Amino acid sequence: PVAYSSNGDGFLEHDKTCFTGKLETELTLENFPSPEDLWERYKKYKGISTKEQENIAAFEYYFDTTGRKPRYYQQIAINRAVEAIAKEQNRILLVMATGTGKTYTAFQIIYRLWKSSTKKRVLFLADRNALLDQTKRGDFRHFKDKMTIIKKKRIDKAFEIYLALYQGLTNYNEDKDAYREFSPDFFDLVIVDECH
Protein backbone atom coordinates (compact mmCIF):
# COMPACT_ATOMS: atom_id res chain seq x y z
CA PRO A 1 0.00 0.00 0.00
CA VAL A 2 3.06 2.30 0.11
CA ALA A 3 5.22 3.20 -2.91
CA TYR A 4 8.17 5.52 -3.35
CA SER A 5 9.65 7.37 -6.29
CA SER A 6 12.78 9.49 -6.46
CA ASN A 7 14.44 11.96 -8.77
CA GLY A 8 17.78 11.55 -6.98
CA ASP A 9 17.29 14.56 -4.71
CA GLY A 10 14.33 13.47 -2.62
CA PHE A 11 11.50 10.99 -2.38
CA LEU A 12 7.80 11.09 -3.03
CA GLU A 13 5.76 8.73 -0.87
CA HIS A 14 2.40 7.48 -2.15
CA ASP A 15 0.66 6.02 0.91
CA LYS A 16 -2.72 4.34 0.38
CA THR A 17 -2.94 3.79 4.15
CA CYS A 18 -3.09 7.59 4.67
CA PHE A 19 -1.17 6.89 7.88
CA THR A 20 0.23 10.43 7.85
CA GLY A 21 -3.10 11.92 6.85
CA LYS A 22 -1.99 12.54 3.28
CA LEU A 23 -1.92 10.35 0.19
CA GLU A 24 1.34 11.84 -1.11
CA THR A 25 4.23 13.31 0.86
CA GLU A 26 7.67 14.60 -0.10
CA LEU A 27 10.42 13.02 2.02
CA THR A 28 14.12 13.40 2.56
CA LEU A 29 16.34 10.40 3.17
CA GLU A 30 16.43 11.30 6.88
CA ASN A 31 12.63 11.11 7.07
CA PHE A 32 12.36 7.81 5.21
CA PRO A 33 10.26 5.39 7.32
CA SER A 34 11.90 2.38 8.95
CA PRO A 35 10.85 -1.18 8.08
CA GLU A 36 9.04 -1.30 11.43
CA ASP A 37 7.07 1.85 10.58
CA LEU A 38 6.10 0.41 7.20
CA TRP A 39 5.04 -2.87 8.82
CA GLU A 40 2.80 -0.95 11.24
CA ARG A 41 1.18 0.89 8.35
CA TYR A 42 0.69 -2.37 6.45
CA LYS A 43 -0.98 -4.01 9.46
CA LYS A 44 -3.30 -1.04 9.91
CA TYR A 45 -4.15 -1.00 6.20
CA LYS A 46 -4.90 -4.75 6.16
CA GLY A 47 -6.81 -4.74 9.46
CA ILE A 48 -4.29 -6.98 11.19
CA SER A 49 -4.95 -6.06 14.80
CA THR A 50 -4.01 -8.99 17.05
CA LYS A 51 -0.64 -10.59 17.76
CA GLU A 52 -1.97 -13.92 16.44
CA GLN A 53 -3.03 -12.33 13.15
CA GLU A 54 0.37 -10.65 12.89
CA ASN A 55 2.22 -13.94 13.47
CA ILE A 56 0.24 -15.62 10.70
CA ALA A 57 0.61 -12.76 8.21
CA ALA A 58 4.33 -12.29 8.91
CA PHE A 59 5.34 -15.92 8.43
CA GLU A 60 7.80 -16.44 5.59
CA TYR A 61 7.33 -18.39 2.37
CA TYR A 62 9.07 -21.72 1.97
CA PHE A 63 12.28 -21.46 -0.04
CA ASP A 64 14.05 -24.67 -1.03
CA THR A 65 17.68 -25.15 -2.01
CA THR A 66 16.84 -24.80 -5.71
CA GLY A 67 16.01 -21.13 -5.24
CA ARG A 68 12.40 -21.59 -6.36
CA LYS A 69 10.13 -18.95 -4.94
CA PRO A 70 6.56 -17.85 -5.56
CA ARG A 71 5.95 -15.60 -8.55
CA TYR A 72 4.51 -12.15 -7.87
CA TYR A 73 0.89 -13.19 -8.59
CA GLN A 74 1.30 -16.31 -6.43
CA GLN A 75 2.61 -14.13 -3.60
CA ILE A 76 -0.49 -11.95 -3.89
CA ALA A 77 -2.79 -15.01 -3.78
CA ILE A 78 -0.85 -16.55 -0.87
CA ASN A 79 -0.79 -13.33 1.14
CA ARG A 80 -4.48 -12.60 0.60
CA ALA A 81 -5.48 -16.14 1.54
CA VAL A 82 -3.29 -16.19 4.65
CA GLU A 83 -4.48 -12.74 5.73
CA ALA A 84 -8.13 -13.77 5.25
CA ILE A 85 -7.55 -16.87 7.37
CA ALA A 86 -5.78 -14.76 10.01
CA LYS A 87 -8.96 -12.66 10.16
CA GLU A 88 -10.94 -15.89 10.70
CA GLN A 89 -12.52 -16.06 7.26
CA ASN A 90 -13.53 -19.69 6.79
CA ARG A 91 -14.02 -19.97 3.03
CA ILE A 92 -11.68 -18.75 0.35
CA LEU A 93 -11.77 -19.33 -3.40
CA LEU A 94 -8.66 -18.89 -5.51
CA VAL A 95 -9.30 -18.81 -9.24
CA MET A 96 -6.10 -19.25 -11.23
CA ALA A 97 -5.55 -20.18 -14.87
CA THR A 98 -4.06 -23.47 -16.04
CA GLY A 99 -0.30 -23.53 -15.62
CA THR A 100 -0.09 -20.72 -13.07
CA GLY A 101 1.00 -22.96 -10.20
CA LYS A 102 -2.17 -23.51 -8.19
CA THR A 103 -0.75 -26.53 -6.37
CA TYR A 104 2.46 -24.68 -5.50
CA THR A 105 0.36 -21.76 -4.27
CA ALA A 106 -1.68 -24.18 -2.13
CA PHE A 107 1.57 -25.65 -0.77
CA GLN A 108 2.82 -22.19 0.24
CA ILE A 109 -0.48 -21.38 1.98
CA ILE A 110 -0.44 -24.69 3.83
CA TYR A 111 3.24 -24.31 4.73
CA ARG A 112 2.80 -20.84 6.23
CA LEU A 113 -0.27 -21.80 8.23
CA TRP A 114 1.21 -25.14 9.31
CA LYS A 115 4.60 -23.75 10.37
CA SER A 116 2.97 -20.88 12.27
CA SER A 117 0.91 -23.54 14.14
CA THR A 118 -2.31 -21.92 12.95
CA LYS A 119 -3.52 -24.97 11.02
CA LYS A 120 -1.91 -28.23 12.15
CA ARG A 121 -4.05 -30.82 10.35
CA VAL A 122 -4.64 -30.28 6.66
CA LEU A 123 -6.66 -32.23 4.09
CA PHE A 124 -5.77 -31.69 0.43
CA LEU A 125 -8.39 -33.14 -1.95
CA ALA A 126 -7.89 -33.81 -5.65
CA ASP A 127 -9.86 -35.56 -8.38
CA ARG A 128 -7.35 -38.17 -9.63
CA ASN A 129 -4.47 -40.31 -8.37
CA ALA A 130 -1.97 -38.86 -10.83
CA LEU A 131 -2.48 -35.41 -9.33
CA LEU A 132 -2.03 -36.71 -5.77
CA ASP A 133 1.14 -38.63 -6.66
CA GLN A 134 2.54 -35.64 -8.54
CA THR A 135 1.70 -33.36 -5.60
CA LYS A 136 3.35 -35.66 -3.06
CA ARG A 137 6.52 -36.06 -5.14
CA GLY A 138 6.57 -32.43 -6.26
CA ASP A 139 5.46 -29.34 -4.38
CA PHE A 140 4.45 -31.12 -1.16
CA ARG A 141 7.61 -33.25 -0.85
CA HIS A 142 8.93 -30.86 1.80
CA PHE A 143 6.35 -32.16 4.28
CA LYS A 144 8.19 -35.53 4.17
CA ASP A 145 7.08 -37.89 6.95
CA LYS A 146 4.33 -35.53 8.16
CA MET A 147 2.25 -36.33 5.06
CA THR A 148 0.30 -39.33 3.80
CA ILE A 149 -2.00 -40.24 0.93
CA ILE A 150 -5.25 -41.85 2.04
CA LYS A 151 -5.64 -44.98 -0.10
CA LYS A 152 -8.07 -47.87 -0.05
CA LYS A 153 -10.03 -46.09 2.67
CA ARG A 154 -7.27 -46.84 5.22
CA ILE A 155 -6.74 -43.98 7.62
CA ASP A 156 -3.80 -43.39 9.95
CA LYS A 157 -4.44 -40.37 12.17
CA ALA A 158 -0.77 -39.96 13.09
CA PHE A 159 -0.07 -37.59 10.19
CA GLU A 160 -0.60 -33.85 9.86
CA ILE A 161 -0.96 -33.42 6.09
CA TYR A 162 -3.41 -35.74 4.30
CA LEU A 163 -3.83 -36.08 0.55
CA ALA A 164 -6.95 -37.83 -0.72
CA LEU A 165 -9.26 -38.29 -3.68
CA TYR A 166 -12.79 -36.97 -3.26
CA GLN A 167 -14.12 -40.41 -4.11
CA GLY A 168 -11.50 -42.02 -1.86
CA LEU A 169 -13.28 -40.72 1.22
CA THR A 170 -16.75 -41.88 0.20
CA ASN A 171 -18.35 -45.22 -0.53
CA TYR A 172 -21.60 -46.50 -1.96
CA ASN A 173 -22.60 -47.40 1.58
CA GLU A 174 -22.78 -44.13 3.54
CA ASP A 175 -22.28 -45.95 6.85
CA LYS A 176 -18.82 -47.08 5.68
CA ASP A 177 -17.58 -43.78 4.23
CA ALA A 178 -13.93 -43.27 5.15
CA TYR A 179 -14.45 -39.63 6.03
CA ARG A 180 -16.64 -40.74 8.95
CA GLU A 181 -13.49 -41.94 10.74
CA PHE A 182 -12.57 -38.28 11.22
CA SER A 183 -14.42 -36.09 13.69
CA PRO A 184 -15.99 -33.00 12.07
CA ASP A 185 -13.29 -30.79 13.61
CA PHE A 186 -10.31 -33.09 12.90
CA PHE A 187 -8.97 -30.96 10.03
CA ASP A 188 -8.05 -27.33 10.60
CA LEU A 189 -7.80 -26.64 6.87
CA VAL A 190 -9.30 -28.34 3.81
CA ILE A 191 -8.07 -27.45 0.33
CA VAL A 192 -9.95 -28.71 -2.71
CA ASP A 193 -7.78 -28.68 -5.83
CA GLU A 194 -9.39 -28.63 -9.28
CA CYS A 195 -12.73 -27.65 -7.78
CA HIS A 196 -14.90 -27.61 -10.90
Where would I find each of the regions flagged by the language model?
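ATP-dependent helicase/translocase motor core
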Residues: 1-121, 126, 130-145, 157-161, ...
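Short acidic low-complexity segments
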Residues: 148-156
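Walker B catalytic acidic pair
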Residues: 193-194
